[in-house]
Design a protein with these regions (language model features):
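Conserved alpha-helix/loop element of class I SAM-dependent methyltransferases that forms part
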Residues: 12-41, 51-55, 59
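Class I SAM-dependent methyltransferase SAM/SAH-binding core
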Residues: 41-44, 48-108
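A short acidic, Gly/Pro-enriched loop at the edge of an enzyme's catalytic core
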Residues: 105-120
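A short SAM/SAH-binding and catalytic strip from SAM-dependent methyltransferases
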Residues: 118-132
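Conserved class I S-adenosyl-L-methionine
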Residues: 148-173
Length: 189
């Protein structure tokens, strides 16, 4: 990474550092895991204290690998400390699971190379990205050909919103988040 790009990320580092450590990343923490990831290389972005990465590591099995990255050093330390008692591999977990410090916009902080993952997994934190376009470009960089981006993001609406209304809200939210580069059929006005 060149120095100019690294300097441009200084505001991102400040942004992530300012997020409340007591509340952490706020979002819906339900977790859906793809059924077909055994043996895959998975990157868990903004893994917090590792709970999801543990489940992903169990799902990829002994022939797969999971790296959890988070912008908070305390979260990374807590995840590393918790793994031996939470991952089925016990003390040999390092062969299947690793945690590292990195922001979504700069995964090279964790020495993550181009085209090195089959799945980039983001659970309920994409809305907190400092720069969504830069983060999405970084996810594309680390995905291997044929790799997938798995985004689990809660959308909440009033109870009386009908199905078409929910679809419009989701579409409008996606359009807004991506600068109107993406749209869902039937979304928007």
């Amino acid at each position: 990474m060149n120095e100019r790009f690294a300097a441009s990320l200084a505001p991102a580092l400040s942004y992530y550092a300012a997020l409340s450590p007591a509340a952490g990343f706020q979002g819906r923490c339900a977790m859906s895991i793809p059924a077909d990831i055994e043996g895959k290389r998975v990157l868990d972005v903004c893994c917090r204290k590792g709970k999801g990465a543990f489940a992903l590591a169990d799902a990829v099995g002994p022939s797969g690998y999971v790296i959890g990255v988070d912008p908070d050093t305390d979260n990374v330390a807590a995840a590393c400390a918790a793994v031996p008692k939470n991952h089925r591999a016990g003390s040999s977990w390092e062969r299947h699971l690793r945690f590292s410090l990195a922001i979504p916009e700069n995964l090279s902080q964790a020495c993550i190379e181009d085209a090195s993952f089959d799945l980039v997994y983001i659970n309920s934190v994409l809305n907190l990205a400092w720069s969504l376009p830069v983060a999405l470009a970084e996810f594309a960089r680390v995905l291997a050909p044929g790799g997938r981006l798995w985004v689990a993001q809660g959308v909440f609406a009033a109870d009386d919103l009908d199905a078409q209304g929910e679809r419009a809200v989701i579409g409008d939210g996606a359009d807004a988040a991506l600068g109107n580069d993406v749209g869902l059929p039937g979304a928007g006005a």
